[in-house]
A protein has these predicted regions:
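Periplasmic alpha-helical coiled-coil/stalk elements that build and connect Gram-negative outer-membrane
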Residues: 182-306, 426, 433, 471-472, ...
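Acidic, low-complexity, intrinsically disordered peripheral segments
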Residues: 20, 78, 266-284, 289-297, ...
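Small/polar, glycine/serine/threonine/aspartate-rich low-complexity segments that form flexible
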Residues: 23, 72-151, 288-298, 332-336, ...
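Extended, hydrophobic alpha-helical segments in both membrane/secreted and soluble proteins
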Residues: 226, 243, 327, 342-346, ...
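A glycine-/polar-enriched beta->alpha junction
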Residues: 34-44, 51-66, 103-130, 137-143, ...
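Bacterial Sec-dependent N-terminal signal peptides
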Residues: 1-25
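Amphipathic alpha-helical coiled-coil segments
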Residues: 45-60, 187-212, 246, 264-269, ...
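Bacterial Sec-pathway N-terminal export signals of envelope proteins
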Residues: 21-99, 153-168, 172, 234, ...
Length: 524
């Protein structure tokens, strides 16, 4: 029975281990970046701003939609005649009237500014008075049919005149679509920058655990050597307490490093857009720190060339350029709206009438020669608010917005230039720090190995060995941090120059090179 339970527990454990092993998320830079494009909330929300801008464009296009309109009105009326009314001899004091009015038409505003209107109207009425309008006896409720077709064209002469003014709101909306796309690109780049920094922090935390564990191993080595030396009466027994204390301290540092590793993993998942459960499934970091030769770094980088690349590639700079164009158009529209409304309308109409009952009379009312009415005309409409405060206020606000945006654009360009200078300087310094950290690490390794040999020969103290071991560990950590600073400097320069991600037919893409190499000026 116990054997059976053991087998069940064993296979259950293997199954669970296999399940979690299969669900691990491969933690390489390109892979997690692609996951972020799909799952990161900031990226998703940024994409919705594009859809919102496209919806605004659709709203502006609605101004030029074809509008169909129709109306049907049915009315019955009972009018009590005056006593002196001669119609009382033919009807019993009450004049009963029935009326039907129907109209339908099409109205459209053209992109050249004109408004066209085509409408059809039909009217029918009858009453219980037995004589018609020509004093002929026709009997009660004899129908009268009237129909007409009207065509009008309205041309604005001042406000709203011309294609440039009429379509300006539509073109402004198109600029805001382009603005939202460029802003989305910069948002994606900034998110990938944060992911890159979080990844290098995760990789650093992972390597720190390795270093502390290696350090533990070195201390245990020293402990074993110390025990042997004590047995050989080459060292006092009191030295063992020092080594044990150092070992306990190193185990504490390893535990703290593992805690930092856990936090770094969760923070990387946060930057990607993963849930808590998904973040805990992130595997060990796959990509190592970039090397200096691999990065294509060179001394005396051309700041001017990188600034030029940034002005061509940065999404936020392109976005504010579109906003400036849109505000310029909005300003022109506000200026036009300060003008009076003066519209010239030309119209033609055709109508006819017929009397009688029956459905055939309804259609004959459009073609009957008798009662035909054909004409044309024009009208001039003038509208202008006396103070015109609304138009003047909007004009003043748009002028302020335009000038404010110019200052904002200049400030952004100024900050981009400063940021690129800082990024290049940071890269230069990180290379120097990395090279010096490597030299220091090699020296400390050599010194520690020498102290170990001396210890085995009984030529140095345990305290000296512990001191050199701590310096070696500190040097290894500083070397890792120097690498992290170098890696972050590369992606920061990429982000500042707008070369961290690229827009493809299927969305944003990137490759591993953007995390390992600085921008190549010749490619831009």
């Amino acid at each position: 029975m116990r054997f059976y339970k053991f087998i069940c527990v064993l296979f259950t454990g293997v199954g669970i281990t296999g399940f979690y092993g299969q669900s691990k998320i491969n933690c390489d830079l390109v892979g997690i970046s692609n996951i972020a494009f799909e799952k990161n909330p900031t990226i998703q929300r940024s994409a919705y701003t594009i859809k919102s801008a496209e919806a605004d464009f659709q709203i502006q296009r609605s101004v030029f939609d074809v509008n169909l309109f129709s109306e049907v009105a049915v009315k019955t009326n009972r009018y009590t005649l005056f006593g002196e009314d001669p119609r009382n001899q033919f009807i019993d004091k009450i004049l009963k009237t029935n009326t039907l009015d129907f109209s339908a038409g099409v109205r459209k505003k053209l992109r050249t500014g004109q408004i066209t209107d085509i409408s059809l109207k039909y009217g029918f009425n009858n009453n219980n008075f037995p004589y018609d309008g020509f004093n002929q006896y026709v009997g009660a409720f004899w129908g009268n049919h009237v129909s007409s077709v009207n065509l009008s064209l309205t041309q604005p002469l001042l406000r709203g005149r011309g294609r440039d003014v009429t379509t300006i709101s539509e073109r402004i909306s198109q600029l805001y679509i382009e603005n939202s796309k460029s802003s989305n690109e910069f948002t994606n780049s900034n998110t990938i920058l944060q992911i890159g920094q979080a990844y290098w922090n995760y990789y650093l935390a992972y390597k720190r655990v390795e270093i502390y564990k290696q350090n533990e191993g070195r201390v245990r080595n020293v402990l074993d050597v110390t025990k042997e030396l004590i047995k050989a009466d080459k060292k006092p027994a009191g030295d063992l307490a020092q080594v044990n204390a150092d070992l306990a301290n190193q185990e504490k540092l390893t535990a703290l490093a593992e805690q930092s590793l856990f936090e770094a993993r969760v923070n990387l998942g946060r930057a990607i857009g993963l849930s808590n459960e998904e973040s805990l499934q992130l595997g060990i970091p796959v990509n190592d720190f970039p090397t200096i030769p691999e990065s294509e770094y060179r001394i005396d980088l051309d700041r001017t060339a990188f600034i030029k690349i940034a002005k061509e590639k940065r999404g936020d700079l392109q976005a504010v350029g579109k906003i400036s164009d849109a505000l310029e158009m909005q300003y022109r529209l506000a200026e036009n709206n300060t003008k009076p409304q003066l519209d010239l309308t030309g119209f033609v109409f055709y109508g006819s009438a017929i009397a009688g009952n029956g459905i055939d009379k309804t259609f004959s009312s459009f073609t009957n020669n008798e009662g035909r009415n054909l004409g044309a005309g024009a009208k001039l409409t003038f509208t202008f608010p006396v103070n015109n405060n609304l138009a003047k206020g909007n004009y003043a606000k748009d002028l302020v917005s335009l000038n404010d945006q110019k200052i904002s654009n200049e400030n952004l360009q100024r900050n981009i230039e400063l940021n690129i200078s800082n990024a290049i300087n940071k890269l230069d310094n990180s290379v120097i720090v990395l090279e010096r950290a490597k030299e220091a690490l090699d020296s400390y390794k050599e010194a520690f190995n020498s102290e170990q040999v001396k210890l085995q020969a009984g030529l140095t103290t345990i305290l000296n060995v512990i001191l050199f071991q701590e310096r070696l560990t500190s040097s290894e950590l500083e070397y890792l941090q120097a690498y992290q600073q170098f890696a972050n400097a590369i992606i920061s320069l990429r982000h500042e120059t707008g070369t961290l991600i690229s827009q493809g037919d299927r969305g944003f893409t990137l490759n591993q090179d953007v995390f390992y190499t600085i921008p190549n000026i010749a490619n831009y």
